[in-house]
């Protein structure tokens, strides 16, 4: 019996479509367990940038989630934003795959 919650029941095509997503999340996992402990935990946002990136890639895939993560990383600096900044529940209405910069919030924590 197949159901959507079980990854083992997915077809090979569905599994192949998840490979980029898994690759992106694996890179974040690698960062969390290697470089992050050496640099220290000093993110200006909640959730941290690595948690944000992991959620964004899981929710929207590597392409859109990667652009959202890039925008978040560029905002996380001494002159950037700080505070609570959650991953959006839905992709922006004007975002298209061929206009990837529209996926990210480039300024402000709660700005659209």
From Swiss-Prot:
Q: Which Pfam families match?
A: YidD
- Places the protein is found: Cell inner membrane
Q: How does it sit in the membrane?
A: Peripheral membrane protein
Q: Which PANTHER family does the record match to this protein?
A: MEMBRANE PROTEIN INSERTION EFFICIENCY FACTOR-RELATED
Which segment of the chain is annotated as a signal peptide? Answer: none
In which domain of life is the source organism classified? Bacteria
Protein family membership: Belongs to the UPF0161 family.
Q: Which protein is depicted?
A: Putative membrane protein insertion efficiency factor
Q: Name one GO cellular component term.
A: plasma membrane
Query: What job does this protein perform?
Result: Could be involved in insertion of integral membrane proteins into the membrane.
- Keywords annotated in UniProt: Cell inner membrane, Cell membrane, Membrane
Q: Which NCBIfam families match?
A: membrane protein insertion efficiency factor YidD (TIGR00278)
